[in-house]
């Protein structure tokens, strides 16, 4: 029985297929030799091989360029400890200048020193634990602070004037007390208050000019003006009642 099968492909299609079989993919390179006798062996470019091994391609694409953005614990501790040292530096310098650093300390002074060490330790733990939060907040605050750098001159003058007034009052109070021990305590307290307050005034006046001087005076005048008006109204009401006692009846 003869096979009457006839191919529907034209001779031109058969030539194109032969050319395609011998063409080389420029991206993949020449096909390696394929041994069909090995069990489970598949051509490296087959669809089944690509489907079964997608992880290798993903690893090759993402094996480079991956970095860890988290800060090491040692660097975080160093930054937090440095910030605490900078905060305590003015007090240390003042005590060293007065030659009162660890001299003539009694029970009260050592208790205060131990409490201050405890506060610094807790602050170090807090700054280390919330490092990401306060570092981002400080970064945003510094950027906003530097945008208003033109106000720094007037802010510095106002904070300097505040320091001069406070120092004058501290000298008067220390000389009035007379006792060296109480005078030293008054000086240390006044210096600490002056340092913290002057820094806060400088920052506030730089960010919003007049917030600590003009606005404060306006609010004080408005408050006292309101109190005066209330007092005048009460006096006028009492005077009218005394002049017209019949109206009350």
Curated annotation (Swiss-Prot):
Its main location: membrane. Disulfide bonds: none annotated. GO terms for biological process: meiotic drive. It is found in: Spore membrane; Vacuole membrane. Keywords: Membrane, Transmembrane, Transmembrane helix, Vacuole. The chain crosses the membrane at residues 73-93, 110-130, 151-170, 187-207. Pfam families: WTF (PF03303). Residues 1-40 are annotated as: Disordered. Belongs to the WTF family. Acts as a suppressor component of the dual wtf meiotic drive system, and can suppress but not confer meiotic drive by compatible poisons. Wtf meiotic drive systems promote unequal transmission of alleles from the parental zygote to progeny spores by encoding a poison and an antidote from the same locus; the poison is trans-acting and forms toxic aggregates in all spores within an ascus, wherease the antidote is spore-specific and targets aggregates for degradation by the vacuole. This is Meiotic drive suppressor wtf25. It comes from Schizosaccharomyces pombe (strain 972 / ATCC 24843). The gene is wtf25.
């Amino acid at each position: 029985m003869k096979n009457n099968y006839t191919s529907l492909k034209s001779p031109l299609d058969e030539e194109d297929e032969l050319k395609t079989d011998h063409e080389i993919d420029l991206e993949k390179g020449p096909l390696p030799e394929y041994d069909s006798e090995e069990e489970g062996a598949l051509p490296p470019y087959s669809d089944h091989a690509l489907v079964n091994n997608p992880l290798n391609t993903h690893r090759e694409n993402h094996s480079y360029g991956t970095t860890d953005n988290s800060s090491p614990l040692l660097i975080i501790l160093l930054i937090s400890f440095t910030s605490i040292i900078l905060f305590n530096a003015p007090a240390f310098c003042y005590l060293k200048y007065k030659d009162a650093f660890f001299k003539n300390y009694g029970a009260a002074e050592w208790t205060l020193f131990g409490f201050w060490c405890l506060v610094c330790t807790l602050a170090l733990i807090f700054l280390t634990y919330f490092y990401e939060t306060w570092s981002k907040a400080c970064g945003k605050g510094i950027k906003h602070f530097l945008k208003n750098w033109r106000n720094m001159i007037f802010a510095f003058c106002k904070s300097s004037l505040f320091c001069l007034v406070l120092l004058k009052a501290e000298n008067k109070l220390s000389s009035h007390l007379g006792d060296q021990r109480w005078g030293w305590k008054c000086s240390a307290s006044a210096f600490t208050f002056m340092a913290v307050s002057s820094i806060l005034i400088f920052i506030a006046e730089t960010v919003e000019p007049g917030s600590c001087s003009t606005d404060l005076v306006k609010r004080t005048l408005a408050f006292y003006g309101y109190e005066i008006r209330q007092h005048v109204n009460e006096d006028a009401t009492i005077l009218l009642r005394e002049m017209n006692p019949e109206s009350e009846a």
